[in-house]
Amino acid sequence: MNIKNHIKQMLLGAGLLLAVLPSEAQNIIRPKIAGPNGLWVNSYNGVLFFGQTDMETQNSQMPMQLRFYYNSSAQSTNYGYGLGFSLGYEMRYRINEIGGVVIETGDGRSDTYKKFGKEFEAPAGVFSKVEEYESGKYRLTEKSGEQYFFDDAKYGKVTAMTDRNGNKTIFTYQDSLLVRVQDAVGHTINLSYTDGLLRKATASFHKGSISYEYDGLRRLKKRTDALGNSTLYSYDKQNRLCEITDANGHKTLIAYNNSGMVSRMKTDVSDKSIRYEGDKTVFIDYTAPQ
């Protein structure tokens, strides 16, 4: 389904872009509104999310990266990286009240596989397969061939993954927190925690370490890379991310309406407004064209 087919009206001129997106077409694919500096907004529910890569291999046949995601609807959830933040590797599963398997990915997506006998049925629009390959152990197979293994019912988290060529990556936990990632060619990521919060990340392929600091409400407030460059994070009274300041002092501001939906994203060079009007979402870009 092409997102362009959902755009009913678009006006471009004098630095103003207005798009009207109908929400009734959101059953499987929900158009995302692009914001500044890698921010995105779900046009259906107004949730803010973005990804942040802190480490990654270069020119490797087996890529590995340390990547975090923020989701404003999870502002009360702490996975060990500050409220609202999750780690890309942190896939989780649980069994629901009727025996189905619910799998949540690191970016916050949640899919429920309904149980029918010994089989599990994927939700509409999802082409992955879930199976209980041993008692209490589950395997998720993607259409592309990647497989994810959930062998520890205590924590309900992914314990290993294989790519379509059979190369295996192993995840090690301590007290439910991911402390080590190791792939088949020897790349490793090591994570250190204090009081249940990530404080330092190191990797075999990355020079130096990255440090993380939090406020008294367990919200990520500062990230500092190996060169001493820091990114700062601020929040509103509802624990939603409302300001990001990069190492050069440039700010990205995020505002929310009374329903907790993103209503504005602003930087020194861009200004984007979003209104939610019944069955449609109105997106206005005030940024002057270059």
Role assignments for model-derived ranges:
Residues 1-83, 89-91, 95-102, 108-110:
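Intrinsically disordered, low-complexity segments enriched in small residues
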